[in-house]
Design a protein with these regions (language model features):
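C-terminal beta-signal and terminal closure region of outer-membrane beta-barrel proteins
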Residues: 232, 236, 312-317, 361-388, ...
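Outer-membrane beta-barrel signature, preferentially recognizing the C-terminal barrel domain
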Residues: 16-19, 28, 137-155, 241-280, ...
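Conserved small-residue
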Residues: 310, 329-421, 452, 461
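Surface-exposed loop/turn segments flanking beta-strands in extracellular/periplasmic regions
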Residues: 1-3, 7-14, 59-74, 114-142, ...
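Extracytoplasmic gating/loop element in the C-terminal half of outer-membrane beta-barrel translocons
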Residues: 138, 177, 447-538, 543
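Extracellular loop and loop/strand-boundary signature of outer-membrane beta-barrel proteins
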Residues: 15-20, 29, 33, 70-79, ...
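Outer-membrane beta-barrel transmembrane domain signature of Gram-negative proteins
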Residues: 23, 27, 68-167, 220, ...
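Surface-exposed extracellular loop regions of Gram-negative outer-membrane beta-barrel proteins
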Residues: 26-97, 101, 149-181, 185-200, ...
Length: 581
């Protein structure tokens, strides 16, 4: 038997050689559509779609591996069957008379989703390894999960325009979901919008050469979100525990029959501007108030449950979005277009039911604070004389202010609300160039003002607590002698007061600029291709994630929130040939 580990640690190269994993998915999709014109302006149509997939997932741990050795080899097979049916039936009316244009739609929609997951695991494989479960002697576990989801909707909408200047629309839908109890499953949602194209007005014509387009937009409405759990309103039971030698059911989740739709009330004001028939600008301001906010609320452990899915309160999002598109240069042989977009959003919890605040993982949900506010001890740096990690105690005085006394014992430091992970601004910058038979385009993405928490820091930055685990390159900056000024404490074997304690030390900026994509293409001249009977020929190079500047580069800056051991996005290069006949 080959030795897989040193001091109970993995030999990752040999582990990859002897273990096995594969996943295979078969997917089929189909659509059937029928339409009939009842009259010239009245049309009825039906669309039925089916989306089916079957996934087979197998994982084998060899007896030669560290984990597999415990079981003398272990195999796990998982098969997942999914099917979604969707039916949409529409009645559409449209009519234009004079300068007036009217259209109306009524619809009835049904969605049904079935999910089945089958799982089995066995151990004790023979010497001549055949990795199928049939070659393992002893069962470990088996399980089956069945889930269903259904949604029924009644929809109606009306659109009106006059003289390509005035526009108005109204929509209404009534949705019923199996995820909610019969008393709360139906929700009514609607929206109203209007716009005015001022550039079509007679008094704007003198400015037409400069102000080629000007449009005001406004909308208000409410839509709904469903809980992620299919059975959140029902208490569920699991059979698996044994009592007196017989399997017995136990209540695994607590249901909430009062669970209802999460509702978003949104107001949007927009302005579209066209300049010189060359530059187009869209500016939007929005505010969205979420009521009956869906969240899992922590429960007292005496209840026997850790949390309860419920409608906990209200939250407000406010922001602006800007988009600019420009045809910078356009000649016979050369063109250059640019697109730039920017978004800014901030949110705040307005109200929480029962409690003014509660902790949810690494976040605190607190009235008056952003929804994704990190809640941790506050790191105070390193003592330059001893190399010990320092923390602010953050005890609240009689005025509610936090004290900032530095302590070396993390147990004496209280967690407080710290950073909001949401970026202040984010967006993209795109350019496209065409010169005769050459085309070049690239896309830059950017984000500033956001933060993330490195959940892997308790291993990579533990300052000696686990000496065999891999460490971050920041250890090169660690404190080594009295007088050293650094933010990385000394490395102490078995350290129990270091980075393995969660603190703001592991909060990092997600500021970055990234060359998201680049495409360079060459098109063969038409005269060459006509002789060969080819309509078009193009060779190209494309790349993604080619360059990144990041304020913190130890993991992907596009990952926000709580970041763990995740696979970063790939940097890809591709060469291709396109032929059209």
């Amino acid at each position: 038997q080959r030795q897989m580990c040193i001091r109970d640690r993995y030999n990752p190269i040999l582990e990859a050689e002897v273990n096995d994993y594969y996943a295979r998915t078969v997917r089929a999709m189909g659509t059937a559509k029928i339409a009939y014109n009842v009259w010239d302006n009245l049309k009825v149509s039906s669309v039925f779609t089916v989306d089916y997939s079957l996934t087979k997932d197998f994982f084998f741990q060899s007896p030669d591996g560290r984990d597999g050795a415990t079981y003398q080899g272990r195999g796990r097979m998982q098969m997942t069957d999914r099917i979604r049916y969707t039916s949409q039936n529409n009645l559409t009316y449209s009519k234009t008379f004079g300068k007036h244009s009217v259209s109306a739609v009524t619809a009835f929609e049904v969605m049904k989703y079935d999910y089945e997951d089958l799982y089995a695991a066995k151990k004790t494989y023979g010497q001549d390894i055949n990795t199928s479960l049939g070659n393992a002697a002893d069962p470990i576990d088996a399980d089956q999960k069945l889930q269903e989801d259904a949604l029924m909707s009644y929809v109606a909408s009306v659109n009106y325009s006059y003289d390509d200047k005035y526009y108005a629309s109204f929509s209404f839908r009534r949705d019923g979901s199996s995820r909610l109890s019969p008393d709360t499953r139906w929700g009514n949602f609607w929206s109203l919008s209007a716009s005015w194209r001022l550039s079509q007005e007679r008094f704007m014509q003198p400015l037409k050469s400069v102000l080629s387009d000007l449009k005001l937009r406004a909308s208000y409405g409410v839509n709904g979100n469903l809980p992620s759990s299919y059975y959140g309103y029902q208490s569920t039971y699991t059979t698996g525990a044994f009592y007196s030698g017989k399997p017995s059911p136990w209540e695994s989740t607590l249901g909430n029959e009062e669970l209802t739709w999460e509702k978003n009330y949104a107001l949007n004001l927009g302005l579209d501007i066209g300049l010189f028939s060359r530059v187009n600008v869209s500016l939007d301001w929005y505010t969205r108030t979420t009521k009956d906010l869906l969240m899992s609320k922590q429960l007292n452990s005496i209840s026997g449950f850790s949390s309860l899915l419920t409608n906990v309160g209200q939250m407000r999002n406010t922001g602006v979005e800007l988009e600019v598109r420009s045809n910078n240069i356009k000649t016979k042989d050369f063109s250059w277009t640019t697109a730039f977009n920017l978004s800014h959003n901030k949110n705040k919890i307005l109200k929480l039911a029962d409690l003014p605040w509660f902790v949810d993982g690494r976040y605190v949900r607190k009235e008056g604070y952003p929804f994704n506010t990190i809640y941790l001890r506050e790191y105070a740096g390193v003592d330059p004389e001893t190399g010990s990690a320092l923390y602010y105690d953050n005890q609240q005085d009689e005025n509610g202010n936090y004290t900032k006394n530095k302590v070396t014992d993390p147990g004496q430091a209280s967690p407080i609300p710290l950073k909001d992970i949401t970026p202040t601004i984010s967006g993209g910058f795109m350019n496209t160039f065409n010169y005769k038979f050459i085309d070049l385009s690239f896309n830059l993405s950017y984000s500033f003002g956001g933060y993330s928490y490195d959940n892997a820091s308790y291993i990579l930055q533990d300052d000696g607590y686990s000496v065999i685990s891999n460490k971050s390159t920041e250890q090169r900056r660690r404190w080594q002698k009295p007088g050293d000024i650094t933010d990385v404490p000394r490395f102490v074997y078995g350290n129990k007061k270091g980075g393995n304690y969660n603190s703001s030390r592991a909060i990092h900026s997600t500021d970055h600029i990234r060359l998201k994509s680049l495409i360079l293409g060459l098109n063969a001249p038409k005269a060459w291709l006509q002789k060969l009977g080819i309509g078009n020929a193009r060779i190209y190079f494309s790349g993604t994630n080619l360059l990144t500047w990041a304020a913190y580069d130890q993991y992907d800056p596009e990952m926000s929130g709580v970041v763990g051991f995740y696979t970063p996005p790939l940097k890809t290069y591709a060469f291709g040939l396109e032929l059209k006949f």
